[in-house]
Structures are given as structure tokens and as C-alpha cells.
Amino acid sequence: MKAIPLDKSNVKLLGRALVRDDILRRTLSGTGCEFVFTGCRLTLTVGVDADCHNDGKRCNMPRIAVLCDGRIIVKKVVEERAERFDVVSSDAPETHTVRIVKLSEGAFSLAEVSHAEVDDGAVIAPTAEKPLKIEFIGDSITCGYGVDDSNMQSEFSCEAENAMKSYACVAAELLVADYSLFSYSGYGLISGYSADGERNTREILPRRYESCGFSYSSVDGTKLQDIPWDFSAFVPNVVVLNLGTNDNSFCTFHNEAYREFEDEYLSFLRVIRRCNPNAHIICSLGIMLTEPLPYIENAVRRLGDDRVSVFRYTTQDGLLGFGSNWHPSEDTHRRAGEELAAYVRSIL
């Protein structure tokens, strides 16, 4: 057996995953890697980052999945610095497609893949790039928060998150697209979630967009928000923006703030366009609420870019159930993903 670091030479990185010091860091929702394995034995070593491990709060520990040929063989919360998972064990060489995905978001913890252990004759190679690439920018809905928990009164826990079931990953799968998610629970444009009308300035997404993300954990002492993102690493054909739900919690207390939301939405669209000059930008909303939509439409009109459009999802009404804290259920995410995929097909 031999140990092989996983990096861009032998795997396809998913989302804004980082490789530093021969360790693959899965940061944001949906990040990870995918590769084709040919050999007899494959064991992966995965761990939680040191900061989160030392903190010891299980609700913040990363949740991950390992898939072999599309079948989930591991789905769990990672609580240790190093946990080993046997993926392939055979007497004769076999070929399999393996995907390692972080199901939970990046704010509270990172998941690390230190290496793969394989038999001496084994080969690991990246899977092929898909012709369509989509970036999704959003909040807890895009993270898939609550989709694996039907208790509407649950306290926040990363264990309730499953990015693979989010509308974003559903749409990407239907469109046979590579995806990148940039999403954080509670985040907005002018205010993060507010239960009392006080402006939440801690959770503002645009200030993080041009970095590798945000996390209370660090990568070898460096915060994600201090690492610039290289936009040439993933060049999307489509960018889907799904923000406004958390801003609405603030704006309902301060009706005049909707105009500020519109101005900031316009400013962020200009940032997205600068970073993604050739992408079609879809400004979407509606899975949980629709009040900010007129202001989003105004911002798009003011931008005057014919490759920016507005899309409205069917709003949840409870008939398909709810996840944690009134978040969308798996069936609601499936419906939204199907709606979005159909819209993307119509504009490309």
C-alpha cells in the first residue's frame, strides 16, 4: 500500500476546495473532489479541522459524504482529526468513480482529506470536466440547511445540512453541470437574518465573495476570508444568485430599507459581472418568500445587461413539508431544482 495526496493533478476539485500542504481542504457546502480509481484497494483518511476539533461542539462538526459510482457509502459527521474509510477492497483491479463531498457549510468547520491509501499498482485520475459550469450564490437554502431534519423547531446543527439535496445540486445534476456553491446560512446583502429588526452586519455576503469564503476555523492559521479566490479556477457559464430572504427579515421592520437592498443588489451584480464577464446571471428568489422580488427586478433593469435575468421559484406552502426552522423540505428543493434547470435550458 502507498499513500497519495489528493490534488489537482489526480482529482477534479469541486467548488472552492483548497489544496494546501498536500491536504485537500473541503470548505464551503458541496466542496470536495471527484476521481476515477483503478485498483484493488482504496482507503480515505478524512478529519475535522483542528480549530473545530479543539472547540468540541458536535453541532459545528462537518458532515461529509463519500460516493462510489453514485452510491453513498459514507454519510456522517466527522468528529476526529483522522478517520479512515475503506472505499474499495477487491482481489482484482476494478475501476470506480469516487466523489468526496462536504455536505455542511463552511462557517463553522472545515473537512480535510489528508491522503488516499491505495495498492501499489493503483491509479487515480481526475474525472472529465463537464461542458456546463454553474456557480450558485446564496444563503441557508442554497446550503441545504434543514433538509435532513423534519423538526421545525430544531436548534442549528451542521448535521441537518445536505448540500447534495439542495435545489442547486439538483439543478446541476439535471443539467449535467459542474457546480460551485458560495453560500452561508443567515447571510444577506444589507443585513443578515434579524429576528428583532436590528441590522445584522456580521453576515453580509458580498464582502466575502472575492475570497475563498468565510470560516471561524482556519487553514494552518490563515482564515479563508484572507485567501483571495482565483476566478480562473472555475469559470461558470451561469451564475445563480439567490439572496434576499434574510434581508427581508430586516426590511419588514424598516420598509425604507428595501430601496437600500435594491441599491446593494445592483452593486453586487456589478461585482459578479466583473468577476464572471461571460456568464449569464440569474437573479432568483421565491422558495421561502417573495417580498424583495420587485426590488430585484428594479436592480436588474437599472443594470441594463441583457445577460442578466430574473427567475421566480414556486413558493413553499407546506404541502411538500418543511425542514428545520421552516426551511425547504427535500421535495421542495427537488421541485425548485427542476424549475431552475428548465429555466437554464430555456436561456442557453
Indicate residue ranges for each PLM-predicted region.
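Conserved SGNH/GDSL esterase-like catalytic core that processes O-acyl groups on lipids
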Residues: 28-30, 147, 153-255, 259, ...
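Short, conserved loop/helix-junction motifs that constitute active-site signature segments
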Residues: 129, 234, 273-276
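Proline-centered flexible-loop/turn and helix-kink motifs
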Residues: 277-278, 304
